[in-house]
């Protein structure tokens, strides 16, 4: 609601550190809620950034610990990384 209000007032809105799991970066990925956010951002032409390009033991980390520093193959990318990759490629 606050973002809708800001947009109506002509203020710039950028969604940073968004994700589809609990605010602490863990828990199950809630695809229903994530897709609602994606739809809202697309509808309002709001840019976004997802987190985290890391290999930590948390849901929001996009890489497995075995991933190389660059040139990631699908096997190096965790579930959340694939979700974000798909959303970005769909733009």
What is the role of each PLM region?
Residues 8-91:
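Substrate-binding cleft of secreted/luminal carbohydrate-active enzymes
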Residues 1-4:
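Substrate-binding surface in catalytic domains of secreted glycosidases
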């Amino acid at each position: 609601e606050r973002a809708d209000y800001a947009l109506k007032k002509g203020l710039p809105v950028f969604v940073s550190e968004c994700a589809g799991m609990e605010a602490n970066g863990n828990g199950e990925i809630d695809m229903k809620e994530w897709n609602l956010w994606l739809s809202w951002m697309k509808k309002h032409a709001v840019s976004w950034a997802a987190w985290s390009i890391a290999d930590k033991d948390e849901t929001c980390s996009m890489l497995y610990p075995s991933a190389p520093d660059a040139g990631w193959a699908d096997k190096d990318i965790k579930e959340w990384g694939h979700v974000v990759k798909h959303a970005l490629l769909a733009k």
